[in-house]
Each structure stands twice: as C-alpha cells, then as structure tokens.
C-alpha cells in the first residue's frame, strides 16, 4: 500500500496553527515582560522610600551602606554612577565617594617616596581612618574598593592587584604584567623575595626572574638589599610590615634590613 501524501490543505492548516501558537507565545512574553517591569518599578519605589527613611544610617554606617548597595545592584541601580541625580542628592553618596577618592590620592602621594606607589588595602584603610578622625563617617574596605574603581575609571593609574586574600593598591601608571603580579604574591608572606626563591617556586629561568625584579626596582616598587646573607634580597616596601607605621626613606630602611 502507498501512503497518501500530505495535502495542501493540511499543510496550510498546520502553518496556521503554528502562527497562532507563535502569536500566543509573543503575547505571553509581552505580558511577562510587562509584569516584570511593573515589579521592578514597585521595587525601585520601595527602595527609594527605604533610602529616604534610612539615609542617615546609609551615610554613617559602612555595613548598612554595603547592604543598601547590594539591594540597588539587584535592580541595576548604581548610586555611584553619577555625581548628580536622585540618589546622589538624597544620600550624598556621590560627594562621599568623591571626598574618599581625594583622601586615597593624598595618602598614596604622601607614601609614594616610601613604597613606589604600591600599598596594601589594609594599610590604606588604616591611614584613611586615621586621617578622617574619630567623628567622621565610618569607612570600610568595601568603600575604599568602590572609590578606587571610580578612580581607575578616570584613567589616572589606579588599580588593584590580588595578593594573599587581600589587595595591593597601585597608584602609579606603572606597567605590571602577570609576571610582576605573581612575584608580588610570592613576596607577600615575608615582604621580600630572592632570585632563587622565584626560580624554585615558579620554575623560571634566572633571566626571567631578574628581568621582573629589575623592572620593579626601576619603577621604585622594590628596594635591593645587596648585603643580605646568601644572596641579594628584593624588598617590597608595600609588604614590609616593619615599615607600615613609619615614614622612612630607602636609606633608613637599608639600615633596618638584616
């Protein structure tokens, strides 16, 4: 027996059904989008009411500020996106992060002679708090990170390098590639590193290790202790814990190193 072919009428009927399903699907999608948009508008309204009611806590408490910014992020609102507008005018967060950015720049410039433009996030936090005084708004490390990201977007050399669960803040436009970063991470525990340690830990050739260390010396990010026992040590002042609370020159630091 021969199977009967599908007739033109059946094909047309099938296409009509598919078109209706597609149209119905489009209507459902539009309804869902409209509902989601309405829910977002409602959430944004509640968020604005919450911000208005708790603006003093948001300004004063760093923990409260982090939680509020996480709430904003869920609907794509960035209170830091502009220095003007509803959020900045209501909360003053634009001015807060602008002033914090200025403080960060001042601290980094004051210590550049000592650390070459690299500073741990912990030390930066300590010095910013010290400079603000005990009656100023509280500042968290999260606030610092947000302010640094704003500075980085301005293209003035600021950036962050992950080291041992925290960050090194870079405040100079020095070219640091992945090789430089892994050497900084290697030096994190002791504050210094040697060519032999780099070769043993990273399995590099001597020329590669020396090239990276020479670059760090040239940029002022490392100091050389050529009198160290065994072989020269390359100290990273940003990681050198004995110097964290002291403003000393490289000459003074050489007298302190073993």
UniProtKB/Swiss-Prot annotation:
It holds the Pfam family EAP30. It comes from the Eukaryota. Residues 28-50 form a coiled coil. Disruption phenotype: Morpholino knockdown of the gene results in a stunted appearance, reduced pigmentation, small head and eyes, developmental delay, reduced forebrain size, and aberrant optic nerve and optic chiasm morphology. Its main location: cytoplasm. SUPFAM superfamilies: Winged helix' DNA-binding domain. InterPro entries: ESCRT-2_cplx_Snf8 (IPR016689), Snf8/Vps36 (IPR040608), WH-like_DNA-bd_sf (IPR036388), WH_DNA-bd_sf (IPR036390). GO terms for cellular component: ESCRT II complex. It is found in: Cytoplasm. One of its GO terms (biological process) is forebrain development. Keywords: Coiled coil, Cytoplasm, Protein transport, Transport. Belongs to the SNF8 family. Component of the endosomal sorting complex required for transport II (ESCRT-II), which is required for multivesicular body (MVB) formation and sorting of endosomal cargo proteins into MVBs, and plays a role in autophagy. The MVB pathway mediates delivery of transmembrane proteins into the lumen of the lysosome for degradation. The ESCRT-II complex is probably involved in the recruitment of the ESCRT-III complex. Component of the endosomal sorting required for transport complex II (ESCRT-II), composed of SNF8, VPS25 and VPS36. This is Vacuolar-sorting protein SNF8. The gene is snf8.
